[in-house]
């Protein structure tokens, strides 16, 4: 079985998530709900984007949830 590295994966949370007052908290919550270990609100251009960091469980590619992309080579 080929296990993938536990790289950072972007969240599917909308960019507006981090622009609200409680955005960072919602960002963390949505990342945790998706099975990620943490979250960052990173400035991308003029919007802060919710990005999840480090999958809590390192899944082989074929067992990953469909919204989790394979890491770029």
UniProtKB/Swiss-Prot annotation:
Record bears the keyword Disulfide bond: yes
Cystine connections: 6-58, 18-41, 27-50, 31-52
Signal peptide as annotated in the record: none
Keyword Transcription regulation: no
Key words of the record: Antimicrobial, Disulfide bond, Fungicide, Plant defense
GO biological process, one term: killing of cells of another organism
Family the UniProt entry places it in: Belongs to the DEFL family.
The protein, known as: Putative defensin-like protein 42
């Amino acid at each position: 079985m080929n296990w993938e590295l536990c790289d950072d994966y972007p969240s599917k949370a909308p960019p507006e998530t981090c622009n609200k007052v409680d955005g960072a908290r919602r960002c963390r919550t949505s990342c945790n709900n998706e099975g990620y270990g943490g979250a960052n609100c990173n400035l991308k251009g003029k919007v802060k984007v919710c990005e999840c960091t480090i999958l809590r469980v390192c899944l082989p590619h074929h067992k990953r949830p469909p919204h989790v992309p394979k890491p770029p080579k």
